[in-house]
Amino acid sequence: MANYELTYIVRPDLDKDAKAALVTRFDSILSDNGAKIDKSEDWDTRRFAYEINNYRQGTYHIVTFSSEDEKAVNEFDRLAKISGDILRHMIVAVDLEKLADAHAKQAAATQRAAERRAQREAERNAAQAQSSASNQARTAATTSGK
């Protein structure tokens, strides 16, 4: 069974109900053709680097699914090309083991970065406290000497 990640961009001028109907329709196209949908969610509305069909932004939707054959992929591809509501789409075959490794590496890198930030912040606070204490001592020595 092959695993896929599908990303498609929906026109930004669709209202919520029409967009929900579009997502439901295309999710059912996948499932009716033998795909098992693992996740189907909106990602974000993003600005494009260039205009696509006179639109400067679009709503990205991501679907992860698995399928025995390419029937669901081919049918989605065919109907997405016809639909005027989907500006662009891309289907990628995913190796789940490599994806899990990549997510684990990303999480570890994020954790290390957070630890380094916290350490730098603690060092900065300690240096400021030391500087403040020496300034107070200098001020106290100056005022007591008068």
UniProtKB/Swiss-Prot annotation:
Segments of skewed composition (Basic and acidic residues): 113-124
Listed Pfam families: Ribosomal_S6
Biological processes per GO annotation: translation
UniProt keyword terms in alphabetical order: Ribonucleoprotein, Ribosomal protein, RNA-binding, rRNA-binding
Annotated region (Disordered), positions in chain: 106-146
Record has Glycoprotein as a keyword: no
Positions with biased composition (Low complexity): 125-146
Signal sequence coordinates: none
GO MF entry, a single one: small ribosomal subunit rRNA binding
InterPro entries cross-referenced by the UniProt entry: Ribosomal_bS6 (IPR000529), Ribosomal_bS6_sf (IPR035980), Ribosomal_S6_plastid/chlpt (IPR020814), Transl_elong_EF1B/ribsomal_bS6 (IPR014717)
GO cellular component: cytoplasm; ribonucleoprotein complex; ribosome
Domain of life, per lineage: Bacteria
Xref: PANTHER family: MITOCHONDRIAL 28S RIBOSOMAL PROTEIN S6, SMALL RIBOSOMAL SUBUNIT PROTEIN BS6M
Protein family per UniProt: Belongs to the bacterial ribosomal protein bS6 family.
Function in brief: Binds together with bS18 to 16S ribosomal RNA.
HAMAP family the record matches: Ribosomal_bS6 (MF_00360)
Name of the protein in its database record: Small ribosomal subunit protein bS6
Organism: Oenococcus oeni (strain ATCC BAA-331 / PSU-1)
Gene that produces this protein: rpsF
